[in-house]
Design a protein with these regions (language model features):
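Short, well-ordered beta-to-alpha junction loops that form the rim of enzyme active sites
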Residues: 28-31, 57, 122-125
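Phosphate-handling substructures
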Residues: 43-106, 144, 156, 163
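Active-site-proximal alpha-helix that buttresses catalytic centers in soluble enzyme cores
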Residues: 1-47, 77, 98-100, 104
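Domain-level recognition of soluble alpha/beta enzyme cores
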Residues: 134-162
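Short glycine/proline-enriched coil/turn segments at helix->beta-strand junctions
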Residues: 48, 112-118, 157-159
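Short, active-site-adjacent cap segments at secondary-structure transitions
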Residues: 33-35, 60-61, 126-129
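Active-site signature of alpha/beta-hydrolase-fold catalytic machinery across serine-
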Residues: 40, 129-133
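Generic beta-sheet signal
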Residues: 24, 113-125
């Protein structure tokens, strides 16, 4: 929607206040909304909009049979597991889905393949895992972090901040 597009452009402009975005490699989830976000952010900083890597490992946390349901519908159809997830989002696995812990394991080979700084355009679940894996936020705190649209999450040297 228009708000999301404006937020993507704003994220690009905020990134430019931190670094020269042309000096870093960019990678994004291949899912359509992150590809569009990366394209808009790159356009906002005068970079070729399609010149970035798409990596399947950055796909959002899989909610399995809960995919497409509202939280109210999940609570009604699977009250026991919904209550379990409300208590422990990091470890609870939705039916045929993945927990944040499993997402962390999925991201581990990607993380170990990186060298240097990157611009990563991904999803909220991925950001929460990176907060834990790179910035040392506890698993339970990371799973509860609000992810801000239109802002840049900077992860460096074991710390994080929003710009």
């Amino acid at each position: 929607n228009d708000l999301g597009r404006a937020q993507a452009e704003e994220a690009g402009r905020r990134l430019k206040t931190l670094i020269d975005p042309s000096t870093l490699p960019w990678v994004a989830s291949p899912l359509s909304r992150t590809v569009e976000t990366a394209q808009l952010a790159r356009r906002a900083v005068d970079l070729p909009e399609n010149d970035f890597v798409r990596d399947d490992r950055l796909k959002e946390l899989a909610f399995g049979r809960w995919e497409g349901l509202t939280w109210k519908e999940v609570r009604q159809s699977d009250p026991q597991r919904a209550a379990q997830r409300e208590k422990d989002k990091w470890l609870t696995v939705p039916p045929d889905g993945e927990s944040y812990q499993l997402l962390s394991a999925r991201l581990a080979p990607w993380l170990s393949s990186l060298s240097g700084d990157w611009v990563v355009v991904a999803h909220g679940g991925v950001a929460r895992v990176l907060l834990h894996d790179l910035a040392g936020v506890s698993p339970h705190q990371a799973a509860e972090v609000d992810i801000w649209q239109g802002r840049v999450l900077v992860l460096e040297q074991g710390h994080h901040r929003w710009v």
